[in-house]
Amino acid sequence: MSRSESPRPLLEMRGISKTFPAVRALDNVSLTVYPGEIHSLMGENGAGKSTLMKILSGAYRADAGGEILIDGTRIDIDGPLAARDAGVAVIYQELCLSPNLSVAENIYIGRELRRGNRRWGTIDRAAMARGCEDVLARLSASFGPDTLVDTLSIAEQQLVEIARAVHTRARILVMDEPTTPLSSRETEHLFRLIRQLREEGLAIIYISHRMAEIYELSDRVSVLRDGTYVGTLERASLSAERLVAMMVGRDISGFYKKEHAPYDPGHLLLSVRDIADDARVRGCSLDLHAGEVLGIAGLVGAGRTELARLIFGAEPRVRGDVKVGERTFGAHSPRDAIDAGLVYLTEDRKRQGLFLDMSVRDNINISVCNRDARLGSLDLARGAERARDAIASLSIRVPDANVNVGALSGGNQQKVLLSRLLETKPRVLILDEPTRGVDIGAKSEIYRIINELARAGVGVIVISSELPEIIGVADRVLVMREGEIAGELGGYTQTPITQEAIIALATGSQAELADAH
């Protein structure tokens, strides 16, 4: 049933507030969702999206005064079981599956079928396998009910979560950043499933920071800011400028605006020649100039991250040269790269970039703490001053520099990592998925920093899976396919940087068309 066929909302959350010690996370928030609707929920990290959904899912109890209605009936959701019984299912970024159990066992978890006595009888795994065959077929799953979850890909595990929601007859499905771990092809398949569920009458609440996904899927979009409800836009009224202004509370015109001067083609900062490893990168060459922002695009698995790590010296290369200015450095030496003025921001900040159990101050200073050494001890005051300056310069939202990095939002974590790299005074900066998992406000700050660096003559390489981002920030774009540079767009090639051109190079369709003619 579509929204147009059902004038009555399926879900109404009215006047929802939630207070934690010293923090009011939600203040009188309301949300209305119809059956057969994809309703996106947007807001910066810390806006209250997750808190609102945790109240809906029974993980949190709202403060007194608000109410939740399903089909017009007030519901008391006092825990996850009550939410499930009310027809609410949530698929979090961190999937909630038991890897050592089968698909069927995960679908039936907490509702196991038993032989004989329903409470004490032995689990009837064969009956559970039969019982979930229909839902797996309905979702076009390529695996069976007896498959061990641990053997499935992330996309397939996500499908198990969706199957569990459908099997429990959920009517309201919440999806929190579901495409973050997925490839482009897996994302397309997920979108087909979401649309299918909408046609079947489910109400889908979709949380994402990705504008392209919001435009593609949403029937309506509601925005939260600082724990309050800002407003709801119909699909026909959506625009990036309007959504961003609602989220951050101010107008951000020219979201991707290039504010640096054209780069100097006569001032070469980085020269990479015929670089290769033994698997994923096959003889790539590139140049980067002072004040230039060079984008690197391509499909997942094309070798973009591998190329960046080879250039930086984080992975061994079997051949090729890397030169910063006139300095060539070794085949496997990040220290030499940093000394030459080349730094790399990893795509996985939590596992490869940050020390989550250490303070903001220590994370910012760790790459340059040798500067503060005095007679065998560290000048802590100097490090504290450096951290304060970085917090102010990059607009890092944090009470003070002693807070652990693990407690910060994704956007603020990314800015802490970026500030650490900038303390080394780089000439070349490689940013691998710099805005992944960060909110709109943090994205705009990162774009501002990129522009400022380019204006100062730093050469910046941006690797991104978001085509609007690549097109918006880059002077030139290199497109990778199967470990090689498939083509170049923009700059002095006079070839326009467009999504169609990037996709054609990334998929090989441009080459296929040329061969056909």
UniProtKB/Swiss-Prot annotation:
The keyword RNA-binding does not apply. Pfam families: ABC_tran. Signal peptide: none annotated. It is an enzyme of class 7 (translocase). Transmembrane segments: none annotated. Keywords: ATP-binding, Cell inner membrane, Cell membrane, Membrane, Nucleotide-binding, Repeat, Sugar transport, Translocase, Transport. ATP binds at residues 43-50. It is found in: Cell inner membrane. Its main location: membrane. Residues 11-251, 263-507 form the ABC transporter domain. One of its GO terms (molecular function) is ABC-type D-ribose transporter activity. Gene3D superfamilies: P-loop containing nucleotide triphosphate hydrolases (3.40.50.300). Its EC number is 7.5.2.7. The keyword Membrane applies. Belongs to the ABC transporter superfamily. Ribose importer (TC 3.A.1.2.1) family. Part of the ABC transporter complex RbsABC involved in ribose import. Responsible for energy coupling to the transport system. This is Ribose import ATP-binding protein RbsA 1.
